[in-house]
Amino acid sequence: MPRSGTFTRPYGCVRTPCHSGRVLQGDMQMGLFSQDITSMDDLYMHTLQDIYYAENQIVKALPKMIKKASNVDLKSGLSGHLEESRNHVARLEQAFGMLGCEVKAVNCPAIDGILKEADEVTGDIASAGVLDAAIAAAAQAVEHYEITRYGTLIAWSKELGHVDVAELLEQTLTEEYAADDKLTALAEARLNMAA
């Protein structure tokens, strides 16, 4: 059973904005504390759109990490996760469809910041071993962000009556935990000592 989010307060029977006839637009710039988020439905859809944006940014960023990595196991693990991330994008598109919503993304400053920091930290490292350790740490920061988002979305999906969406997202959460565990094992067994 995958671990899930900590948001368990019941919100009653609420329909998502899509079911109430309101579609959130992709160019809408909602912040977490935005006045545009006035209900649990709004927050749920914003978070779904947020992780959709994040997964797409991760798909764009992973090839650069793979290219910089020198450790064969790290390259292989990141390459495998790139394929998984592409599947995560497809699953999110499926979730939007299950909710009857148009696929939309909202900017996610959190993932932008994590990826920017990863790029900056790994940009000027001359030692291949240190660079691999930095890449693994950056990839884990990404994994941890994804784990929090998917755990929360699973809990909220269940609370809002979208059990089918929760089950779909649980597949992704399981893969995110597995990727994080592999990165931890690799870092502890090889990368950190080689650095």
Q: Language-model features: where?
A:
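Amphipathic alpha-helical hairpins
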Residues: 13-195
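Extreme N-terminal basic, low-complexity initiation segments
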Residues: 2-6
